[in-house]
């Protein structure tokens, strides 16, 4: 997106945050279950599970919910989820990547395709837009860990590639392959991160006007409302004037 703060301001527009939060815990629980099933149910022995729990705690997910999600992975009748990535184009030729965890590929593909079509977009083949994104690691810290200079110094020492700081926190970017190593090094200097995850970062942003931005937001809302969808990434950019209207 066009920087962390701009996209957060858009997506946190009036009334939207509560709707997203109502589904957040179920999505976090699904990632915890998948992570626990993919390895050992012990976070000290399972890096993916450790990160999933860490990210859930950052969103104030209750411990009971976390424990229940881990136990669900051990159940003989538990669902098996597939990790699927969808790629397509939204209004204005914008590129969109959708990550999902699903127990029914046909259902999820149908729902995602329907969302794209209704918004005037089109679902493409795998690889049709991901080439214009970088798959990187992102580690976030609260402002309370220190100023930008302190975080930058720690990030460089840890082998990170970039740091962005705004009024909401510090965002550290590193190579996807080095995410675990960089996160561990940062933990020794800055303490436990708020979130540690892999993200798709657009190489270049596509400017869109207010009308197309509204259509894009409806598309993203529709995708995020799907229980199977875990993450949505895009490369659109709006002017400050349009941003103010969208965030009102």
UniProtKB/Swiss-Prot annotation:
UniProt key word Transcription: yes
MF (Gene Ontology): DNA binding
Domain of life: Bacteria
Keyword line: Cytoplasm, DNA-binding, Transcription, Transcription regulation
Localization per Swiss-Prot or TrEMBL: Cytoplasm
InterPro entries the record matches: Integrase-like_N (IPR017856), TACO1_YebC-like_2nd/3rd_dom (IPR048300), TACO1_YebC_N (IPR049083), Transcrip_reg_TACO1-like (IPR002876), Transcrip_reg_TACO1-like_dom3 (IPR026564), YebC-like (IPR029072)
Pfam families: TACO1_YebC_N, Transcrip_reg
First and last residue of the signal peptide: none
GO BP of this protein: regulation of DNA-templated transcription
GO CC field: cytosol
Similarity remark: Belongs to the TACO1 family.
Listed HAMAP family: Transcrip_reg_TACO1 (MF_00693)
Protein name: Probable transcriptional regulatory protein RL3983
Organism of origin: Rhizobium johnstonii (strain DSM 114642 / LMG 32736 / 3841) (Rhizobium leguminosarum bv. viciae)
